Curated annotation (Swiss-Prot):
It holds the Pfam family Ribosomal_S11. HAMAP family: Ribosomal_uS11. SUPFAM superfamilies: Translational machinery components (SSF53137). GO terms for molecular function: rRNA binding; structural constituent of ribosome. This is Small ribosomal subunit protein uS11. Part of the 30S ribosomal subunit. Interacts with proteins S7 and S18. Binds to IF-3. Keywords: Ribonucleoprotein, Ribosomal protein, RNA-binding, rRNA-binding. It comes from the Bacteria. GO terms for biological process: translation. GO terms for cellular component: ribonucleoprotein complex; ribosome. Belongs to the universal ribosomal protein uS11 family. Located on the platform of the 30S subunit, it bridges several disparate RNA helices of the 16S rRNA. Forms part of the Shine-Dalgarno cleft in the 70S ribosome. It comes from Dechloromonas aromatica (strain RCB).
Amino acid sequence: MAKTATKVRKKVKKNVAEGIAHIHASFNNTIITITDRQGNALSWATSGGAGFRGSRKSTPFAAQVAAEAAGKAAQECGVKNVEVRIKGPGPGRESSVRALNALGMKITSISDVTPVPHNGCRPPKKRRI
């Protein structure tokens, strides 16, 4: 059976002026996703994907590097203004916002969207080291 040549589709370049930066800062990792107003992802990066492993993945510097990577990819899509939504208690919360600001993106608002239970599940036990 003859193989048919698969068509190579060129990636459609989106041109979006303003977007939303979703920062998910957990204790172990930081995930930054930049979307358009409708929620379609334009770019994303993680501390682990930036080359950090183990305990170094959960540092503010790793979150800063990940935010720079996601921000540069979003700037290629034309994003200039960004609204920041932070979720989670992790160490990369503040440094990732500073990194986006240092890239030259205009931050219109910063909001904390960390889900807070109305006394739902019992939290994990305290760590004993």
